[in-house]
Amino acid sequence: MKKNARRMTQAVALLVWGACLAGCLRPSGQEMQLTLQLTPEGMAAETALAEARKTIAERLEEAGFRNPVVETVGRDRLAVRIAGVEDPARVRRLIRANAVFELRFVRSPALESEEAVLAHFKGQLPPDLEILPEEVRGENGQAVETKYYAVEKRPVITGRDLRTARPGVGPFNDPIVAFEVKPEATATFAEATGANIGSRLAIVLDGRVVSAPTINARISDSGIIEGGFTREQAQDLAIMLRSGPLPARLTVVDERIGGQSGG
């Protein structure tokens, strides 16, 4: 009787183990496949394609996707295949965001429209300024309001001046991104911020203001980015800043998720 019970227990254990091999070890989510069209801007297509491939692979691997496949197709396309995708929108952001990072001085108040910014300058925007939007985000990371600033066209530093970036938590337990500046850029950063204490410094990503904090003291080698992020958004921004900007514009020409296609 005891032997039969033991055998039954072993049989059940084998069934559970077999089911786990079939399901537990399989990555959750679906497979996602994308074909990307590359449009080089000021760079040879072959070089841009190689750099884009490397950058996208780095972003996906750092985001936790196991063994993503990024391959060149012809002279101007990339084929991307990722397993275990639970949030396709996140994959699109990681792949398509140029991640062009700049710090620029703000030269107007935050206003409700581009027209209001122009009115602030009596209808004539100075040639060294441009108007950029800021999406103010709520607790869930979604945009709840848009404001506009006049900011200097010339950046103080760019993403190429960053040594590293990492997600963190701010003084009020809100997600942030902390960054460090390369040694060769610290003197420029310190001089510019030291001469503009009391002014606002716009943190610009892909032509949009993420936040525009006031400079309270001279800054030389580090800073933080606050923008009403979720933890995942802060993590992804840090990943994109570390990987650097894409060398060319990418357009999704085909997308398949779990066997379903969408152009």
Question: Where are the model-predicted features located?
Answer:
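Bacterial N-terminal signal peptides
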Residues: 11-22
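Bacterial N-terminal signal peptides that target proteins for export
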Residues: 2-12
